[in-house]
Structure formats: structure tokens, C-alpha cells
Curated annotation (Swiss-Prot):
Membrane topology, record value: Multi-pass membrane protein
Ribosomal protein in keyword set: no
Region (Disordered): 1-28
Name of encoding gene: Yipf3
One Gene Ontology term from the biological process aspect of the record: cell differentiation
Name listed for the protein in its UniProt record: Protein YIPF3
InterPro entries xref list: tRNA_Mod/Golgi_Maint
Glycosylation sites: N334
Stretches in topological domain Cytoplasmic: 2-145, 206-211, 261-271
Similarity remark: Belongs to the YIP1 family.
Organism: Rattus norvegicus
Length: 347
């Protein structure tokens, strides 16, 4: 048995060359036992790897959705921000335009330097121009000088308003559609501005050398005669006295204006049209102011009918010529005072 085993082992040990390499590979392959201590503890199982991969994919999807949402929000906010910025720019432009217009209007109407040349006049000059407005000029061969200021004419218009108010109150005038002050201001300023504009238009048609400012000054100083006539005749009511002052004082101021326009107009037809229109309007306006806002004060009849007659039964009438001329002003003033007292007591 030993002899049989020996060859067998010898055969195994002494195998042919074809088996030598295989045996060496088997012997050199090492042990089949796995050393668990040499394994890496950080390496996970396949299930753990799949979980991590799934979690990573979910995080990437969430990040992609968040990025898409942020992009959409950015686009929406960008459009909204653009519209808001555009509206703010439009509002800012409108505000700036309105501010510029308001500043221009304020600078135009509130700057006193613009109006200073029209009211920069000495009282002595105004007094001399008032006297000159009642003196007609004789030389009409060359254009006469016209004052280019508005202080004197404006003060004369306000004086006429005050005199007209006095005449309305003493004549017991009733204005149903407005106050006495509004009616007086509208009448005086309406005549001054309206007639000046109309005469300036006619002067332009007739080729007269006069400006609107000069026309306002000329007509304004022409109201000086009206103020004197109305102030006297509102306190002393005599038709003869009124017509005398109307022709004398009103005629002198009208002739002064006519002479100035004649000196600045070329052609007889143009002169007749322009000067005739101005003279007619100026003289008729004085008649209107006298007869439209004035009647005899009812208290004057106290000297004729007695103070016991009710005011509603009185009839306006002229003062008879029986009163002496020297006592007439005193009698009229006394009667006017009595009339005012009776009227106040009756109301």
C-alpha cells in the first residue's frame, strides 16, 4: 500500500508540465477565507446606495422646481416692476410739467416788477394829468403824447364806483340781481375796459397810432369830468345844473380825448368815425349814470308836503324855483339829511 501511495504521490508531485502551471495557480491563489477586518467600514450595502441615489434625485427635482418657480416669479415681478416704473415716470413727468406751468403763471402774475412800470408815477404827475384831461389841445398836426400808466385811470374808476354807490344809496335804488357794490364795479370797469377795447379795435381799423395801454390811460383820465359832474349832481339835483356841467366838464374831457385821437389818425373819414364813436359813447355814458341811478331824494319833499306823509306815497319831483338861489344848497342839504332820518325811522 505504501508502495502504491508513493507513486501516486509521486505522480501528483511529479506531474507533467501541463499540470504544473495549474497547480502553481491553485497554490498561489491564497486562502479562500475573507478577512472581515480588512473591509472598509464606510462602504454601504446596495440598498443604502439606492436610497441615497433616490434621495439625491428627489433633491435635484426639488431644486429644479424651485429654480423654475423663481424664474417665473422673476419674470412676473420684472413685468410688474417695469409697469410700476413706467407709471412712476409718467406721473413724475406730469408733475414736473404742472410745476413748471404753475411756476410760470406765478412768476407772471405775482412778480411785482412786471406791473411796476404801469404804476410807478408821482402824485404831482397824476395831478397835472388830471388837470390836462380837462384842457383840449389845439395842435393836431403831430401825434400828441399819451401817458402810459394806469395808476391815475384806475384810481378814477374806483372813485367813480364810490360816487355811483353814493348815488344809488341816496336815490333808494333797488338791485334785484346783485349787490350795489357789484353793480357799480361792473358798470364802471365794464365801461372802461369794454369801450377801450372797442375804440382800440376801431383805431386799428382806421390805422390810428395808439396802443391798448394808451387807450386805457386816455379813457381813464377822461372819466375825471364824469366824477366831478356826478359828485355834484348826486347831492344837488337840478336838471339845468346837470346839463350845464354835462356840456361843460363832460364836453371838455371828451374834446381832449377826441383831439388826441385826431392827432394820431390820418384821413377825415377815419377821424370822423373814430372820434364820433368815442364822443357819443362818452357823453351818453354820463347821461346813463345820472338818470339810471338817481332820482330826487324823497325827503326833499319835507319842505313841500311835510314830514308826516309816508315814504310810499311820495312822488319824486324837481325843486321849484321859488327857493332863493343863495339858500338852495343849504335847503337841499338839510332836506337830504331829514330824508335819510325819516327813511331810517320808517324801516
Amino acid at each position: 500500500m505504501a508502495t502504491q501511495a508513493a507513486p501516486a504521490s509521486g505522480v501528483r508531485n511529479g506531474a507533467g508540465p501541463e499540470w504544473g502551471g495549474f497547480e502553481e495557480n491553485i497554490q498561489g491563489g491564497g486562502s479562500a477565507v475573507i478577512d472581515m477586518e480588512n473591509m472598509d467600514d464606510t462602504s454601504g450595502s446596495s440598498f443604502e446606495d439606492m436610497g441615497e441615489l433616490h434621495q439625491r434625485l428627489r433633491e435635484e427635482e426639488v431644486d429644479a422646481d424651485a429654480a423654475a418657480a423663481e424664474e417665473e416669479d422673476g419674470e412676473f415681478l420684472g413685468m410688474k416692476g417695469f409697469k410700476g416704473q413706467l407709471s412712476r415716470q409718467v406721473a413724475d413727468q406730469m408733475w414736473q410739467a404742472g410745476k413748471r406751468q404753475a411756476s410760470k403763471a406765478f412768476s407772471l402774475y405775482a412778480n411785482i416788477d412786471i406791473l411796476r412800470p404801469y404804476f410807478d408815477v408821482e402824485p404831482a404827475q397824476v395831478r397835472s394829468r388830471l388837470l390836462e384831461s380837462m384842457i383840449p389841445i389845439k395842435m393836431v398836426n403831430f401825434p400828441q403824447k399819451v401817458a402810459g400808466e394806469l395808476y391815475g385811470p384806475l384810481m378814477l374808476v374806483f372813485t367813480l364806483v364810490a360816487i355811483l354807490l353814493h348815488g344809488m344809496k341816496t336815490s333808494d335804488t333797488i338791485i334785484r340781481e346783485g349787490t350795489l357794490m357789484g353793480t357799480a364795479i361792473g358798470t364802471c370797469f365794464g365801461y372802461w375796459l369794454g369801450v377801450s377795447s372797442f375804440i382800440y379795435f376801431l383805431a386799428y381799423l382806421c390805422n390810428a397810432q395808439i396802443t391798448m395801454l394808451q387807450m386805457l390811460a386816455l379813457l381813464g383820465y377822461g372819466l375825471f369830468g364824469h366824477c366831478i359832474v356826478l359828485f355834484i349832481t348826486y347831492n344837488i339835483h337840478l336838471h339845468a345844473l346837470f346839463y350845464l356841467f354835462w356840456l361843460l366838464l363832460g364836453g371838455l374831457s371828451t374834446l381832449r380825448m377826441v383831439a388826441v385821437l385826431v392827432s394820431r389818425t390820418v384821413g377825415p373819414t377815419q377821424r370822423l368815425l373814430l372820434c364820433g364813436t368815442l364822443a357819443a359813447l362818452h357823453m351818453l355814458f354820463l347821461l346813463y349814470l345820472h338818470f339810471a341811478y338817481h332820482k330826487v331824494v324823497e325827503g326833499i319833499l319835507d319842505t313841500l308836503e311835510g314830514p308826516n306823509i309816508p315814504p310810499m306815497q311820495r312822488v319824486p319831483r324837481d325843486i321849484p324855483a321859488v327857493l332863493p338861489a343863495a339858500k338852495l344848497p343849504v335847503a337841499v342839504v338839510n332836506a337830504t339829511a331829514k330824508a335819510i332820518a325819516v327813511t331810517l325811522q320808517s324801516h
